Curated annotation (Swiss-Prot):
<dbReference type="InterPro" id="IPR001638">
    <property type="entry name" value="Solute-binding_3/MltF_N"/>
</dbReference>
<comment type="similarity">
    <text>Belongs to the bacterial solute-binding protein SsuA/TauA family.</text>
</comment>
<dbReference type="GO" id="GO:0010438">
    <property type="term" value="P:cellular response to sulfur starvation"/>
</dbReference>
<dbReference type="GO" id="GO:0030288">
    <property type="term" value="C:outer membrane-bounded periplasmic space"/>
</dbReference>
<protein>
    <recommendedName>
        <fullName>Taurine-binding periplasmic protein</fullName>
    </recommendedName>
</protein>
<dbReference type="GO" id="GO:0022857">
    <property type="term" value="F:transmembrane transporter activity"/>
</dbReference>
<feature type="signal peptide">
    <location>
        <begin position="1"/>
        <end position="22"/>
    </location>
</feature>
<dbReference type="InterPro" id="IPR007210">
    <property type="entry name" value="ABC_Gly_betaine_transp_sub-bd"/>
</dbReference>
<dbReference type="GO" id="GO:0009970">
    <property type="term" value="P:cellular response to sulfate starvation"/>
</dbReference>
<keyword id="KW-0574">Periplasm</keyword>
<keyword id="KW-0732">Signal</keyword>
<dbReference type="GO" id="GO:0015734">
    <property type="term" value="P:taurine transmembrane transport"/>
</dbReference>
<dbReference type="Pfam" id="PF04069">
    <property type="entry name" value="OpuAC"/>
</dbReference>
<keyword id="KW-0813">Transport</keyword>
<dbReference type="GO" id="GO:0055052">
    <property type="term" value="C:ATP-binding cassette (ABC) transporter complex, substrate-binding subunit-containing"/>
</dbReference>
<dbReference type="InterPro" id="IPR010068">
    <property type="entry name" value="Peri-bd_TauA"/>
</dbReference>
<dbReference type="GO" id="GO:0016020">
    <property type="term" value="C:membrane"/>
</dbReference>
Amino acid sequence: MAISSRNTLLAALAFIAFQAQAVNVTVAYQTSAEPAKVAQADNTFAKESGATVDWRKFDSGASIVRALASGDVQIGNLGSSPLAVAASQQVPIEVFLLASKLGNSEALVVKKTISKPEDLIGKRIAVPFISTTHYSLLAALKHWGIKPGQVEIVNLQPPAIIAAWQRGDIDGAYVWAPAVNALEKDGKVLTDSEQVGQWGAPTLDVWVVRKDFAEKHPEVVKAFAKSAIDAQQPYIANPDVWLKQPENISKLARLSGVPEGDVPGLVKGNTYLTPQQQTAELTGPVNKAIIDTAQFLKEQGKVPAVANDYSQYVTSRFVQ
């Protein structure tokens, strides 16, 4: 009886110790429809890391940057534009994983009466400020020879963009899913981020982590990267087969807020990376993308200063 009681006590103490060591992590995600959402839906990250995970949906990268800066969020999903702003403001974060290289999943959708870029002059175009689509909009206007001041650019979050479009308050918006799908129902795509990237202004979707959290819990960050990369590989290996599996489509539709019929087109709209490609991008190109984006945003008056190097905000150690 004494041995049994002692074992019970030891088990209880071990459980208490485990509870004390358990890691709580808040992850900020956005509504892009991409294969790694399957891992989110299946709670793979929590299972592999042993952490208690709180997934929180945000409408834009700018709000995620604020949450990261305050410490409310430890891991977050950002586009390259809010990333460049965060790095320029010295927010203590680092990129540890690429979610995707953005393509036609982000687009400038306008009223059907707008047939050419010049028709944008004097029109009211909405975009979430300091987002990848804000950067892409400014880059597109520059490519077309249109000054930002010639267009009324308004700062709206995606849900507000949908409402403003339905009321007729705006003539167009550069945005992502599910808002881009809502606007396309009775609008037209004037350009998208794949084309803008070909014009010299590519955009990325990345995962970042607070540096203090990464230093304290490297195994948790590594588990996150592994869960996301593993979820993407079946799609990379055979996109058509992956997209024909109903459970994949339903999971992405639920987390992205788009109709299931729209999911395949959105998934195909971006480029996803193998582990080897992740390492290659994180050891040079991502730093260059931050520099290029920050320099462009400085030209547009969106950031006050630009550094010559942002490599301290990028790491490949969690994907190797």
